[in-house]
Amino acid sequence: FSIKCFSFDLEAMELGYDKIKERLGELRLKKFGLTVKEQDLIGTLEVALEMTARGFKFGSVDLNKSHSKNFIIDEDQKTLIPPFRAIDGLGDTVANNIIIEREEKEFISIEQFQKRCKVSTTLIEKMRLMGILKNLPESSQLSLFDMM
């Protein structure tokens, strides 16, 4: 499963079969009012629905494991980890920057991650909401309160 698709509903995919089916139903009800992105999403969700029906599970995008374009199998969790490109608005350049920078040195803060990988504030906010950055502090600076 690679990133030949351009639209993903990562939340629905992670929640599984029932949520994917529900989302497909919502899109199909719209029929003629679908955007190009929503039309692409239908195909992606149909594949995801089939995969979940066969026992596959989707995980979350993972800062330390995700590939730029390909889904990765997480043997421990028995899930497919989505690539960075599955995040709406995140392009090839940023996805590749994340991989390169991650291999070079561990990220110690969101601030440092954003600078090193050249990620926009909008994408940082999306990644926060998706829980991708949950293990990183905002800043690299130490606070007196952190030392207590």
Predicted regions and their residues:
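Noncatalytic, beta-rich nucleic-acid-contacting surfaces in large DNA/RNA-processing enzymes
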Residues: 1-148
